[in-house]
């Protein structure tokens, strides 16, 4: 049975960390192993500190606009992205490593230019409808500023055009009353934070914490310029060996490679998130939160929420095509593992930046309500069997830009408290 403990002082949950960390430590070496060891040591030492306990249990300001600890508490405020002016990223090595071969000619032809006009128009309409429905469900909706992403920019290390302000989940993560800007890893996303600054400054003035992770230079050394990509089999072998297009030259991560479950936050090493980036998050959030690395049989890992999506206390959707190597740890902790059905999105529908498994990239409005694609009947039935009501919207054209409901949003405020689901 899943055990849930509200954090009101006392134990810091070192036992739970030992349970997860010790087992994960057996499957990893080098940097990853040292990360878990240092996390365990930091947590254990904090258990003897009254000051640390006080810090962890300080109440948030009652009027703080930012407060979210997990993926399922009742949603009160959310940022929803924009498809307007979205541009195809230049076909650089990091973009090639994250996209399917059949779309490479598309990137080579249109890189630096807007996505197809008619497609963007449909995507914009879909997201507007999504915003309207969220408002009807009682959720406050914020939108990023519109920006012309076709403008070329240059740093001392590279030049590029932009991408979009469509996926706030990729760049922002809320932990408690703190909103963290991720540094990103694609050169086309270097200045993506600009679309969200007016919103974040407003939250900051109203009492939220605001942190920007160290911005990488994105110099050539951050990328394996000779990353060998010839087939899915090659990618499987490379991922199994812990080899990705991003190196450990400097910290980089996308916020969407982290998923929250109260005190415990799970992260994956991916094509856009390196161990240095995960280590930065671990150090930044310790001792109040515990960051754990998990991995999957995934030839092209990029963002965790279409592979492993936590939808309730002790309840997770686990992609059958990308099984989690550490899934037994969750089972032993009393979690329920749900395997979502195969997506029904047609083969000829363009998915320039993602896979069909966006069907499981859902947004929980609370434990009993989920926003799901209107076309994905099999997963709707799955949720209904779980006793979860479905709010159906079609965002197929918006999917083409690389995200489902979870990707298109960043939940800023959920009504709930910090709890531990592994103690």
Curated annotation (Swiss-Prot):
Active-site residues, Swiss-Prot/TrEMBL: 254, 303, 407
Residue list for modification N6-acetyllysine: 385
Residues modified as Phosphoserine: 46, 49
GO terms for biological process, alphabetical: creatine biosynthetic process; learning or memory; muscle atrophy; positive regulation of cold-induced thermogenesis
Tissue localization of expression: Kidney. Expressed biallelically in placenta.
Residues the record lists as binding arginine: 170, 305, 322, 354-355
Pathway annotation: Amine and polyamine biosynthesis; creatine biosynthesis; creatine from L-arginine and glycine: step 1/2
Keywords: Acetylation, Membrane, Mitochondrion, Mitochondrion inner membrane, Phosphoprotein, Transferase, Transit peptide
EC number per UniProt: 2.1.4.1
MF annotations from Gene Ontology: amidinotransferase activity; glycine amidinotransferase activity
Organelle targeting peptide span: 1-43
Main function: Transamidinase that catalyzes the transfer of the amidino group of L-arginine onto the amino moiety of acceptor metabolites such as glycine, beta-alanine, gamma-aminobutyric acid (GABA) and taurine yielding the corresponding guanidine derivatives. Catalyzes the rate-limiting step of creatine biosynthesis, namely the transfer of the amidino group from L-arginine to glycine to generate guanidinoacetate, which is then methylated by GAMT to form creatine. Provides creatine as a source for ATP generation in tissues with high energy demands, in particular skeletal muscle, heart and brain.
Protein name (record): Glycine amidinotransferase, mitochondrial
Species of origin: Sus scrofa (Pig)
């Amino acid at each position: 049975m899943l055990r849930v403990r509200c954090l009101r002082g006392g134990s810091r949950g070192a036992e739970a960390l030992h349970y997860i960390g010790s087992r994960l430590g057996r499957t990893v070496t080098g940097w990853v192993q040292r990360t878990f060891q240092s996390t365990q040591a930091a947590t254990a030492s904090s258990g003897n500190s009254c000051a640390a306990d006080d810090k962890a249990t300080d109440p948030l300001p009652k009027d703080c606009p930012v407060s979210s600890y997990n993926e399922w508490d009742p949603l009160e405020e959310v940022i929803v992205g924009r498809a307007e002016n979205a541009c195809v990223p230049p076909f650089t090595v990091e973009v090639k490593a994250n996209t399917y071969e059949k779309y490479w000619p598309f990137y080579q032809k249109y890189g630096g230019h807007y996505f197809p006009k008619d497609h963007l128009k449909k995507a914009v309409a879909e997201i507007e409808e999504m915003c309207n429905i969220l408002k009807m469900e009682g959720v406050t909706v914020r939108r990023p500023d519109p920006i012309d992403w076709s403008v070329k920019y240059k740093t001392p290390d590279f030049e590029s055009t932009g991408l979009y302000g469509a996926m706030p989940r990729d760049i922002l993560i809320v932990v408690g009353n703190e909103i963290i800007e991720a540094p990103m890893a694609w050169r086309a996303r270097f200045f993506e934070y600009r679309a969200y600054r007016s919103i974040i400054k407003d939250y900051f003035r109203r009492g939220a914490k605001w942190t920007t992770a160290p911005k990488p230079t994105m110099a050539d050394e951050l990328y394996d310029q000779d990353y060998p990509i010839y087939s899915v089999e090659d990618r499987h072998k490379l991922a199994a060996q812990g080899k990705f297009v991003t190196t450990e030259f400097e910290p980089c991560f996308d916020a969407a490679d982290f998923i929250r479950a109260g005190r415990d936050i799970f992260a994956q090493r991916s094509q856009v998130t390196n161990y240095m980036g995960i280590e930065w998050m671990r150090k930044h959030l310790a001792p109040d939160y515990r960051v754990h690395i998990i991995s999957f049989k995934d030839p092209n890992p990029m963002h965790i929420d279409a592979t492993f999506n936590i939808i309730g206390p002790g309840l997770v959707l686990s992609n059958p095509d990308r099984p989690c190597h550490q899934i037994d740890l969750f089972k032993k902790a009393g979690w329920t593992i749900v395997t979502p059905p195969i997506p029904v999105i047609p083969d000829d529908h363009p998915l320039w930046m993602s896979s069909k498994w966006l069907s499981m990239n859902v947004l929980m409005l609370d434990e009993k309500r989920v926003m799901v694609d209107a076309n994905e009947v099999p997963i709707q039935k799955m949720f209904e069997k779980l006793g979860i009501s479905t709010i159906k919207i079609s965002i197929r054209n918006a999917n083409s830009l690389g995200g489902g409901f979870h990707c298109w949003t960043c939940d800023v405020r959920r009504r709930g408290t910090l709890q531990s689901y592994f103690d």
